[in-house]
Regions:
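Membrane-embedded alpha-helical bundles that constitute the cytochrome b-like, heme-associated redox core
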Residues: 1-134
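Primarily the internal scaffold of c-type cytochrome electron-transfer domains
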Residues: 27, 127-156, 174-208, 225-531, ...
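TPR/TPR-like (Sel1-like) alpha-helical repeat modules
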Residues: 732, 738, 742-773
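Structural marker of alpha-solenoid helical repeat scaffolds
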Residues: 631, 665, 699-700, 733, ...
Length: 809
């Protein structure tokens, strides 16, 4: 008997050590190995010849092997457990050698038995043990594009077990982090989401909620609890995005977002759903053979940015809005097409190294959780901008609010009271003081630049998020002289303020203020700022004729998670959401003291030039970049930025001159080569343009803007096949690019491929904007003067002396 037990021990140990067992077979072998190990001493000491034998070495080695085995059951094989595993293997080998000397069985027969057992184990390992116990019912998730591996629903108790990950002794830190995240409260435990769904259900049919469910209520959706109107009182309706959902995603078919992923039921170790002693056995099996668990729960796709895109890239289509395809929030494409990803050759700014979503939103946190790397794990707080959830009465969590505040204030945004235009003259870059005279009209130039942000500012749902610019002028007693963007007594922000947001309109020209995107038809304006870019906001002020004292001019970028209208609509128990001051700048306005200008302000000029270029004020932009090249002559981007303006002005030779200067500073600078390629394309030198684009493409193969320029150049050169290949590369990056589908339609018409031309024509018509919707915007412009002002590409905000302060004079 004992030879068979030792044979089982050896066979299972060899397989576990040298073969990659799947997620079910591995823990099963571990369990067999442990049971055999427990039986060995029982049988061993039951033999009379052993009882009479006083061999100390065999007893010592066996006790050591048993002790280290028990140690592995307790500690697992991670960290210090690796050392225990080494001792366990060595002591077990020595025990077997000694056992041969004192046990009466045939060595050859033992080898044959062990070999046979090993072969049986190997054959068993080939079997597909990944079959899972799912409800035998074909699922219908439409209009969500999400799916399950089997095509069936998954039992809720298989994908709603986050607490087990935290209480099993394996991932308590990660579980606590997740418990304080928006992912935890994505479902009907989030009153803002619940109010949105309630309104959706009251204005549409019940199937539309499944479109929301794939990202917000995956436990409900994939377990079949969203077939009709969801029961929001079920525990599953409050599950959030669980561990098993994110880590159960095994494939992302494309990058169109909307939760277009494939979910698999988690592969479970034996006794996974047991309690008491058997639950302890389950935890022990995971600890002693975690490789299979790790392989199943952490796949390469989980570390990719496309994994995040599946829910943070959104579109609405006819089944949802009964209108047409519209692009919703899209953090992925904003990141992909930016300098943050190192994909955009023409980016104004790049971080020191490329960053992914996880770099910012899953930064490493200190932890002793099992599976930590050097006492660190990927953070699962998922910090962003949500201070609303931890402010709710039922969830009040100051630690969460403070953590989010620190994240928002971590150099994400820079604000700069750059200059003032007085009597048509720009006085800049300002230092700490500006001198004015009574009666003068002053236009302040306030620059806001995105810094440590990998997508547009703001991200997410730009219609409900509320970042804005607040300008306040106070006297030396702290009394307000003038302001723009202050919070009013009714808790709404001053409607004349400058907002960094998008205003969405429904078919009647009303603002979308109920988180009701299914009724969205067009956008009145979108004042968000791209990553690594800048905007300039203009404020006009007429200096009072009796102006005598100094004024402290303070500019702040504020952030409130939801505007007041959304809060009123969503909450039964109204609260005041926190306002986070993300960035601040200040100067003193004086009648007597002279203006102070700043030194070493080349990059401030660069930001101003970028902002003015985005507003198409080419002269102001060019003058700003001229100052950059004077103040920072070794900054190659300064000359490239000059060339950008000159190209838009049609001054191609002057632009080439600036680009040559940049190339003198940085040999083969891809950014300079790219703009030289654009000049060659515009002037009809297609051969030179193609050569330059090929050079740039070697460094930036995933730059969609560059590829579209390259493809169009090939089209102009009548290289239809080459143009087609390049444009198809663009679709690999963004399958929903309307412009690319249009150009491919033209190319296939030239090639005589009517089928492909028709295909791309249909895609173009699907993804292109609806020009007729502009009429809705015109109606809204007449009704909402402040929003109409914001919708102008270049506009200013008037600073008016407050009534109550003027009464003090």
């Amino acid at each position: 008997m004992i030879k068979y037990l030792i044979g089982i021990q050896v066979a299972t140990a060899l397989y576990l050590q040298f073969f990659q067992a799947d997620e079910i077979f591995a823990p099963t072998l571990v369990l067999i190995h442990i049971i055999a190990g427990i039986l060995v001493p029982i049988v061993y000491y039951g033999k009379s010849d052993i009882q009479n034998n006083k061999n100390q070495p065999v007893i010592i080695t066996f006790v050591f092997a048993l002790a280290t085995g028990i140690g592995l059951m307790v500690a697992g094989v991670t960290g210090f457990g690796q050392l225990i595993l080494g001792f366990h293997i060595i002591s077990s080998l020595i025990f077997i050698i000694f056992a041969f000397q004192f046990l009466t069985f045939d060595f050859i027969k033992f080898i044959l038995v062990t070999g046979a057992l090993f072969i049986i184990v190997v054959i068993a390992g080939v079997k597909d043990w990944s079959a899972i116990d799912q409800e035998n019912k074909i699922a219908n998730f439409s209009p969500s594009p999400g799916s399950t591996q089997s095509g069936n629903y998954i039992k809720a108790n298989k994908i709603n077990r986050s607490a087990r990950c935290g209480t099993s002794g394996c991932h308590p830190d990660i579980y606590q982090q997740w418990s304080q995240s928006a992912h935890r409260f994505s479902s009907f435990n989030n009153p803002f989401y619940k109010a949105s769904v309630d309104y959706l259900l009251s204005t549409s049919d019940t199937t539309t909620v499944r479109w929301c469910g794939s990202c917000h209520d995956p436990v409900m959706l994939y377990s079949g609890l969203m077939v009709g109107t969801p029961d929001v009182d079920l525990p599953e309706a409050h599950a959030g995005i669980t561990c098993e959902i994110c880590h159960g995603i095994i494939d992302i078919p494309d990058i169109t977002g909307n939760a277009n992923y494939v979910l698999d039921s988690p592969i479970e170790y034996p006794f996974s759903h047991s309690k008491g002693m058997l639950a302890a056995v389950n935890r022990m099996l995971i600890r002693t053979k975690p490789e299979a668990h790790r392989k199943a729960m952490l796949q390469p796709l989980h570390k990719s940015e496309t994994f995040c895109a599946t829910c943070h890239k959104v579109s609405l289509d006819v089944p949802i809005n009964h209108y047409k395809w519209l692009r919703g929030q899209d953090e992925y494409d904003a990141w992909q097409a930016s300098g943050v990803s190192y994909n955009a050759v023409a980016a104004f700014y790049n971080p020191p190294q490329s960053l992914t979503c996880q770099s910012c939103h899953m930064a490493m946190e200190k932890s002793n959780d099992r599976g930590n790397d050097y006492q660190k794990v990927f953070g699962h707080f998922f910090p962003a901008a949500n201070t609303a959830l931890p402010s709710l009465t039922d969830l009040k969590n100051s630690e969460w609010i403070n953590r989010t505040t620190r994240f928002l204030q971590d150099d994400r945004i820079n604000i700069d009271i750059f200059g003032a235009i007085i009597d048509s003259e720009l006085i800049a870059p300002l230092g700490d003081r500006l001198q004015v005279k009574p009666g003068q009209q002053v236009r302040f130039e306030v620059i806001v630049r995105t810094k440590k942000i990998g997508h547009t500012f703001p991200g997410g749902t730009i219609d409900s998020n509320e970042p804005w610019l607040e300008i306040v002028g106070t006297n030396q007693n702290g009394e307000t002289f003038f302001s723009s963007g202050s919070i009013q007594p009714d808790k709404h922000v001053d409607p004349s303020a400058h907002f960094f947001r998008g205003v969405l309109l429904d078919g009647d020209g009303e603002f979308i203020l109920k988180r009701n995107p299914h009724e969205w038809r067009t956008t009145l304006y979108n004042n968000s700022i791209p990553p690594g870019s800048a905007d300039v906001i203009h404020y006009t002020w007429v200096v009072p004729s009796d102006f005598e004292e100094e004024i402290n001019l303070i500019a702040k970028v504020n952030y409130r998670k939801f505007n007041r209208s959304i809060t009123i609509h969503s909450l039964d128990e109204l609260i005041d959401l926190p306002v986070v001051e993300m960035a601040k700048d200040a100067i003193v306005i004086s009648r007597l003291e002279k203006t102070e200008l700043a030194n070493n302000a080349g990059m401030r000029y660069n930001d101003y030039g970028i902002a003015m270029l985005r507003q198409n004020n080419l002269e102001a932009s060019r003058l700003a970049f001229e100052n950059v090249t004077k103040l920072i002559p070794g900054y190659a981007d300064g000359y490239v930025n000059m060339a950008r303006v000159l190209i838009k002005e049609g001054k191609f030779n002057a632009a080439k001159f600036q680009l040559d200067k940049a190339l003198d500073l940085k040999n083969n600078f891809p950014k300079a080569k790219y703009f030289l390629a654009l000049i060659s394309k515009i002037t009809g030198d297609y051969k030179e343009a193609i050569s330059l684009f090929k050079f740039v493409r070697e460094t930036y193969p995933n730059d969609r803007a560059m590829l579209k320029d390259f493809g169009q150049t090939q089209y102009f050169a009548e290289n239809w096949i080459d143009a087609s290949l390049i444009y198809n590369d663009v679709l690999r990056i963004d399958p929903e690019d309307a412009e690319t589908h249009y150009n491919l339609m033209l190319i296939h018409q030239k090639l005589g491929d009517i089928g492909q031309a028709k295909y791309h024509s249909e895609k173009y018509l699907k993804y292109k904007p609806d020009e007729q919707a502009r009429s809705i915007s015109q109606t809204a412009r007449l009704r909402f003067p402040h929003a109409n002002n914001e919708a102008q590409q270049v506009h200013s905000h008037q600073l008016i002396q407050t009534d109550w302060f003027s009464t003090l004079k």
